[in-house]
Structure formats: C-alpha cells, structure tokens
Amino acid sequence: MSKEKFQRIRTHINVGTIGHVDHGKTTLTAAITTVLSKKYGGCARAFDQIDNAPEEKARGITINTSHVEYDTEFRHYAHVDCPGHADYVKNMITGAAQMDGAILVVAATDGPMPQTREHILLARQVGVPHIVVFLNKCDMVDDLELLELVEMEVRELLSQYDFPGDSAPIIQGSALKALEGDEKWSSKVLELSSILDNYIPEPKRSIDKPFLLPIEDVFSISGRGTVVTGRVESGIIKVGEEVEIVGIKDTVKTTCTGIEMFRKLLDEGRAGENVGVLLRGTKRDEVERGQVLSKPGCIKPHSNFESEVYILNKDEGGRHTPFFKGYRPQFYFRTTDVTGTIELPKEVEMVMPGDNIKMVVHLISPIAMDDGLRFAIREGGRTVGAGVVSRVIS
C-alpha cells in the first residue's frame, strides 16, 4: 500500500499581477506556474488557459479574473490575473481578490505607461501593502543603460505613490523566454519566487486582529437581556469581556455576559463564526443593525471619508445616465445602508456609468470605519457602484 505524501502546512499568501496592457502580466503568470511546477510540483497553466478568464460576480459586478495557484520553497500562493484594465479596477476596488502583495510587470521596451501609474495609484488607494517589480522583455533590450533608466523611472513612480521605491525589489527577466524553458530566464522566475517569499511578510490573520462583529440582528430575551447576532469579522470575544457598540449613535460600553452558537453556550466566539452575544444592561432599542460590536477603542465612527469608487455600467445593472455633484445615494457598509452626499474632484463635472473616480463622501450618520473598508453604492436597493475607503477624514 503506497503511503500518502506528507503535507507540510504552508503559509498562504494572496498575490496578483498588475501593470500596463501587453506588458506581459499573463505571460508572467503562465511562466511562474510552469517554472515552479517543475521544481516544487503543482499545476502548470498555459497562457490561453489564463487568458480566457471566467466571469465572476463580486458585489453584483461582473469581473473577469483568472485564479492560479503555485508553491514556492516556503509558501503556497493564490495568484490573480485579469485580462482587461477595467477588470483590474473592479477587482481592486471591490476587494474581490484581496492582495497581500502585487507583482508589478513593466516591459523594459516601453518603460512605465499610463496604466502602470494607474495600477500603482489604485494599489495605494485600496491598501495593497507591498509591490515587487518584474521588469519584463529584458531579452529584447541590449542597452544596459536603458534598463537602468527604466528601473529608475519605476522607482520614482513607486515613491510618488508612497511605496518604498528605493528599496523595492526589481527583477530583470523575460516571461516569454522563461515560459519557453530557457534556463537563464527561468532562473529569474525562481528569483522572483524567493523574493515573494522574503519580501512580502506573513499577513496578520483575522483571528489575531482586535475583536469586531458587525451587528446583523438584535433580540431581547426576557429575564436575560439583549442579544446581538452576526459573524465575527476579526479577533476573539470571551464571556466577561468589555465591548463597545460603535456607529450610527453615540458609542456605548457594555459587557458580554454570554455567547451562543447554534443554541449552545460557548466561552468564546472566534473570527468566522456566527454567534449571538448577550449584552449586560443594554436595552433592545439602544442597539441596531449596522452598528458594530468591538474591542474598546479599536474602531471609531466617522461620517466623512475619501474613497476610490467604480460605477457600474448599464450592462452590469447599473445606472443608464451620469450623475453630478450633490448626488445622494445610499452607501452600504457591512450590514446597512446610510445616505450620503458626494463631492467630486474639481476637474470632474459628471460621472458616467463604467467610470472609476475618487470622491469625498459625507454620510448623514457615522459608521464604524477604518481605511480599507469596502462599501457598495445603492439606489433603492439596487447596486450602482462599489468603493473602498482610502482615507478617513476625522
């Protein structure tokens, strides 16, 4: 009887390729899976398999995304690649594929182009924490000075958007040659894989973050008090701990006196679990859906924020007409809608369906939020846009 192969539990990291159209993002994705599958096992994916990306829906928005996976020496990676520029914009704004780090692909033959800049800006706005650069098509450049020049431009561009341009790793390679099996260039892909292992730190797991539970429902149980239910977004809650109720109304402190899951009593509720939390001395009408239960002091309510937003086009079920400043839709955060008004950048008169845009939002009541929180924009219950908080304005 053959023995099962021993599986070491590996750190799981989410990455993706970003960069200008035709600079080689998909070719590099194929090359990574091909080169690494030879060394560490796993499945090689051909260019066509990745390029014909299936449609997915995230927050009601159709996005074409290819997901591949591969192993490196120390880790397991899930990697996203998008065929079109619009798909990147939607993907990054909706957080459909959250990235722990991105591989920026820049063709050495072109240098940084408009979408290179736009993707770096988006990565900054939506909180992609780390960028590694793959300078592609270096087999087509004989002039070493030209390579140095392109590298300098890329570093300047990264620094412009608050990434560490001076210290960001840049690998000079050729995705196509590596995909064709050329050893010199395959070694560059292996170099990229070890840089991913060393440069992108292990992400903080949601269980290690402070406790947060978006409230979905509120009940009162006679003789026991008020119970709020929801899915624990992060951290751990234990019986007897002090918690805060944040958002919509003034922040209130209370104590958790009991935790239930599937009608069983628990000592604690953990990230990912659906639980009911019994609150001491809290009245039924003091809590509502849309607030959050959190570890005291770890999240504050805010009404004003800067955001990066994608507006659905009409084929996606969005608006058929543009909107202008003073537009008042609902902003759906976690479990609830809050009305807000928008401020557009000075040079923008109107926003068309299918656009992505920076806007400042003023909500009529405050919501517990931090930078990086995702939201949907809705009109009468229908999603017309998706956004991410890029900066809270206190």
Curated annotation (Swiss-Prot):
Residues 174-176 are annotated as: G5. One of its GO terms (cellular component) is cytosol. Residues 60-64 are annotated as: G2. InterPro entries: EF-Tu_GTP-bd (IPR041709), EF-Tu_GTPase (IPR050055), EFTu-like_2 (IPR004161), EFTU_2 (IPR033720), G_TR_CS (IPR031157), P-loop_NTPase (IPR027417), Small_GTP-bd (IPR005225), T_Tr_GTP-bd_dom (IPR000795). It is found in: Cytoplasm. GO terms for molecular function: GTP binding; GTPase activity; guanosine tetraphosphate binding; translation elongation factor activity. GTP binds at residues 19-26, 81-85, 136-139. Its main location: cytoplasm. Mg(2+) binds at residue 26. It catalyses: GTP + H2O = GDP + phosphate + H(+). The keyword Glycoprotein does not apply. Residues 136-139 are annotated as: G4. Residues 19-26 are annotated as: G1. Residues 81-84 are annotated as: G3. Its EC number is 3.6.5.3. Keywords: Cytoplasm, Elongation factor, GTP-binding, Hydrolase, Magnesium, Metal-binding, Nucleotide-binding, Protein biosynthesis. Residues 10-204 form the tr-type G domain. PANTHER family: ELONGATION FACTOR TU, MITOCHONDRIAL, ELONGATION FACTOR TU-RELATED. NCBIfam families: EF-Tu, PRK00049.1, PRK12735.1, PRK12736.1, small_GTP. Belongs to the TRAFAC class translation factor GTPase superfamily. Classic translation factor GTPase family. EF-Tu/EF-1A subfamily. GTP hydrolase that promotes the GTP-dependent binding of aminoacyl-tRNA to the A-site of ribosomes during protein biosynthesis. Monomer. This is Elongation factor Tu. It comes from Blochmanniella floridana.
